[in-house]
Amino acid sequence: MNENLFASFATPTMMGLPIIMLIIMFPSILFPTPKRMITNRVVSVQQWLINMIMKQMMNIHNNKGRTWTLMLISLITFIGTTNLLGLLPHTFTPTTQLSMNLGMAIPLWAGAVVTGFRHKTKASLAHFLPQGTPIPLIPMLIIIQTISLFIQPMALAVRLTANITAGHLLIHLIGGATLALMSISPTTASITFIILILLTILEFAVALIQAYVFTLLVSLYLHDNT
């Protein structure tokens, strides 16, 4: 039975309810971590990697901004894990859904903006009108700055959605081409299979990079408002 090219991006449901959270939480329910494995090498490498990334991100923040450290750690871990799980066969990637990414981007962006207006009201308002702006351009510049401010969460969500979706589509297309060429031209099929393997490796890197970029941009928005 032939499926639509975008069928793999449709949200699976059970009795009319989305099962995204069940898919994400199910492995942790089945395989609880024993106490003796809490400090193993894998966990140590994971902690070292997260600490190194957070140290780079939080160096630019003051004490007020560093209160968001736990939130940013949770964010980069969640997005990275979700992206990697979506590369497994017969799985669904929630971050290909714009609605989910907007659900992450808008609250984080709004929290950073509200923090700025609460603690640095004058500085936040000053962003709408840079110093030295000619008087005739003031109304238009304020409108442009306001629009650019409200576009930030949309840009965050669209960037993540587009990058993850594009990679999955390429894997789907090249994988289908490989299967079709196996009976026609085994040599060409071997070449496309090698390309598929390389693209899959690249997608693992993209999955982690996009999690880092999303969290880094949230961190920069926070820095502008604290």
Curated annotation (Swiss-Prot):
Asked if Transmembrane helix is a keyword of the record, the answer is: yes
Which topology term describes how it sits in the membrane? Multi-pass membrane protein
Q: What sections of the protein cross the membrane?
A: 12-32, 68-88, 97-117, 138-158, 164-184, 189-209
Q: Which GO terms describe its cellular component?
A: mitochondrial inner membrane; proton-transporting ATP synthase complex
Q: Name one GO biological process term.
A: proton transmembrane transport
Cited NCBIfam families: ATP_synt_6_or_A
The similarity comment for this entry is: Belongs to the ATPase A chain family.
Q: Name it.
A: ATP synthase F(0) complex subunit a
